[in-house]
Amino acid sequence: MSRKIEGFLLLLLFGYEATLGLSSTEDEGEDPWYQKACKCDCQGGPNALWSAGATSLDCIPECPYHKPLGFESGEVTPDQITCSNPEQYVGWYSSWTANKARLNSQGFGCAWLSKFQDSSQWLQIDLKEIKVISGILTQGRCDIDEWMTKYSVQYRTDERLNWIYYKDQTGNNRVFYGNSDRTSTVQNLLRPPIISRFIRLIPLGWHVRIAIRMELLECVSKCA
């Protein structure tokens, strides 16, 4: 997708109003799911997030307000979440499919467990349409000490296109650090956000076994 199209999508996005957001800073122990007043600095001024005629992601290094996409709430449907080697999920593993990768899920089958433990495994989300994704939340398995310790992210706007790795400032594939226990939620914000339809998490490290509960954060505009 060209920079001009990306810019146009962001311009449309930030033209809408939003009244509910998540803090764009890392959670330091307080509940991140709270209402926050909007500031009207979307255009003009030294802290502007968007300026007239802007056509690149450089104009929006980070998203100020976020909302959960719907893994935990169920708005993200089972058919939107897929994984590597789906045909292997039979017997005991049939309770630990990709659809179980939902933040704060509890009980038996509370996470996605990869059948194989190597860096060729993946968890994929089809957003059904192009969205602006600004963050990723992860947890480990709820009942046993198994979790993902680090991962990379791929994305693409169309299933006919090749996957693109999310890069760091040096141009290398960015490594996101994940969990260190089974219960804590680790938040990684995307600066800049990803504008895409398909998102993949590629586990690069894990404790005992690849186990993921997750949520995606969608970027929403500031109030007009």
Curated annotation (Swiss-Prot):
The disulfide bonds in this chain are C63-C219, C110-C142
Q: Which InterPro entries match?
A: FA58C (IPR000421), Galactose-bd-like_sf (IPR008979), Neuropilin_MCO_CoagFactor (IPR050633)
Compartments (UniProt record): Secreted; Cell membrane
One Gene Ontology BP term is: protein homooligomerization
The membrane topology noted for this protein in its Swiss-Prot or TrEMBL record is: Peripheral membrane protein
Q: Does the keyword Membrane apply?
A: yes
Q: Span of the secretion signal?
A: 1-23
Q: Which Gene Ontology molecular function entries are recorded, alphabetically? A: phosphatidylinositol-3,4-bisphosphate binding; phosphatidylserine binding; protein-containing complex binding
* Outcome, altering R141H: In XLRS1; no effect on oligomerization; no effect on protein stability
Tissue expression as described in the entry? Restricted to the retina (at protein level). Detected in the inner segment of the photoreceptors, the inner nuclear layer, the inner plexiform layer and the ganglion cell layer (at protein level). At the macula, expressed in both the outer and inner nuclear layers and in the inner plexiform layer (at protein level). Detected in retina. Detected only within the photoreceptor cell layer, most prominently within the inner segments of the photoreceptors. Undetectable in the inner plexiform layers and the inner nuclear layer.
User: SMART domains recorded for this chain?
Assistant: FA58C (SM00231)
Gene Ontology CC terms, in alphabetical order: external side of plasma membrane; extracellular space; neuron to neuron synapse; photoreceptor inner segment; protein-containing complex
PROSITE patterns linked: FA58C_1 (PS01285), FA58C_3 (PS50022)
**Domain F5/8 type C: start-end pairs:** 63-219
The answer to whether the entry has keyword Cell membrane is yes
Alphabetically list the UniProt keywords.
Cell adhesion, Cell membrane, Disease variant, Disulfide bond, Lipid-binding, Membrane, Secreted, Sensory transduction, Signal, Vision
Describe its partners and assembly state. Homooctamer of 4 homodimers; disulfide-linked. The homooctamer has a flat, cogwheel structure with a diameter of about 14 nm. Two stacked octamers can assemble to form a hexadecamer.
What is the disease in the record?
Retinoschisis juvenile X-linked 1: A vitreo-retinal dystrophy characterized by macular pathology and by splitting of the superficial layer of the retina. Macular changes are present in almost all cases. In the fundi, radially oriented intraretinal foveomacular cysts are seen in a spoke-wheel configuration, with the absence of foveal reflex in most cases. In addition, approximately half of cases have bilateral peripheral retinoschisis in the inferotemporal part of the retina.
> What does the record give as the function of this protein?
Binds negatively charged membrane lipids, such as phosphatidylserine and phosphoinositides. May play a role in cell-cell adhesion processes in the retina, via homomeric interaction between octamers present on the surface of two neighboring cells. Required for normal structure and function of the retina.
- Recorded protein name is Retinoschisin
What is the name of the gene encoding this protein? RS1
